[in-house]
Amino acid sequence: MKLLTTGLLASAALVAAQEQQVLRADEVFGKAPLPDASIFDETIKQFQSSIEDGISHFWSEMKTNFKDYLPMISLPKKHNRRPDSEWDHVVRGADVESVWVQGADGEKRREIDGKLKNYDLRVKSVDPSQLGIDPGVKQYSGYLDDNDADKHLFYWFFESRNDPKNDPVVLWLNGGPGCSSLTGLFLELGPATIDKNLKVVHNPYSWNSNASVIFLDQPVNVGFSYSGSSVSDTVAAGKDVYALLTLFFKQFPEYATQDFHISGESYAGHYIPVFAAEILSHKNTNINLKSALIGNGLTDPLTQYPHYRPMACGDGGYPAVLDQGTCRSMDNSLERCLSLIETCYSSESAWVCVPAAMYCNSAILAPYQQTGMNPYDVRSKCEDMGSLCYPQLNAITEWLNQKSVMKALGVEVESYESCNSGINRDFLFHGDWMKPFHRLVPSVLEKIPVLIYAGDADFICNWLGNQAWTEALEWPGHKKFTEAKLQDLKIVDNKNKGKKIGQVKSSGNFTFMRIFGAGHMVPLNQPEASLEFFNRWLRGEWH
């Protein structure tokens, strides 16, 4: 769904602990027992001798104040795996990997590239009448299994409402990291939402209006996914996504011939460059990747972090949330923040990337969160921090936890939660947050178009920062893209033709959009506008 603020809380907590030396870690991270970190003492001691004073001091404070939380891992979910006989289809990765064909040069090669032998895909045909979601629309759910690593990723597929034999296929990924893509399904762009009475409500602006959509709960231990192990960085998750798509299209070759697009929001700004690059790295594949879409993403922190102060202090098109004194304090902290991020970019080591995330989030992002305003929409207060400021999530979570729903989908875990804060901490404490995944975008742009869109009322991944990193990105089309002017984006597809919904600039394979009146989740706040640009993008406009 969104960039979780758990990282901000952890960062702010560390700063408070440095000042007061009284803050208890269990009050910040919860009371679940975790392994003792004494094994890290010697490692940290040795490392401190080779790093700069600021970073060394940070790790000393971490070891003192959060000793029990350094070896952070997300806890496994209770689950009960169903036998293969209860599934409608089971696709063996080993079978796919064993198929060889003769190429045009007469040489034998594998039909499909990639390390697939450890993966299986289990498929259940979902009866729409049981759930009341899009009756008449074909649906599948199931799990991608990495049997060696004991990882099981849940997915839910909805065929296009329009022309499934010809319409493209889209993968949707929520962010967090650690938020279920089913939040995107029911809160934003899927075929239905859930009201406060737990009734299914049809969504006329669903993205499966003209495309088939796969919603994937990843990484493991998110949503209905589960594992006895954990994934704590973006790159590891990329291999799983490639395997899922490969086996899905192998089972359903009728979709493999159609255009495929990968999309997502928030921390998917990390995921999508990696996942797209992984897919494009394979020469022989059944994934017909045509474009990538990132909404309100975190992709290039070094370029994006300077734009938090302007967005919070009245320079982003909305009234200031913070007072002038707090804004000056953020300005004063920025130089050190950027220096830490630059060091992270140079080494990409957790030892330096974690301090960058902790310091920058506490100094640059946390002041906004402490106001009680919604970090995902500067126009409103946070109604319920427990539901990430969106109380609608409570009904969605309750509906998905019904035994009848779980049975209809073939779910193997005991419960569902919209976001797993443990996953968020895993990624944060492994240094993933600040890594420069934007460096993969130029190679992606060489092969496919990329759309960066941003609701202009979001703070946490705001439009100022997203426009800035797209214009700063070094790639062959940089000069022309930077010189391109923002043009009005208007509706052309329905009765509201001519209505202004945002601004767009495009050159070559790169496009940036600012969507008016939308927060972090554009399809939630502006469903008509989101379906408008989505359909036009899939048709090839702007690229």
UniProtKB/Swiss-Prot annotation:
Q: What keywords were assigned to this record?
A: Carboxypeptidase, Disulfide bond, Glycoprotein, Hydrolase, Protease, Signal, Vacuole, Zymogen
Its biological function? Vacuolar carboxypeptidase involved in degradation of small peptides. Digests preferentially peptides containing an aliphatic or hydrophobic residue in P1' position, as well as methionine, leucine or phenylalanine in P1 position of ester substrate.
Among PROSITE patterns, the record links this protein to:
CARBOXYPEPT_SER_SER
Question: What is the protein name stated in its UniProt record?
Answer: Carboxypeptidase Y homolog A
Active site positions:
266, 458, 520
Q: Which family does it belong to?
A: Belongs to the peptidase S10 family.
Compartment(s) of residence: Vacuole
Glycosylation-annotated residues = 210, 509
**Species per Swiss-Prot/TrEMBL record:** Arthroderma gypseum (strain ATCC MYA-4604 / CBS 118893)
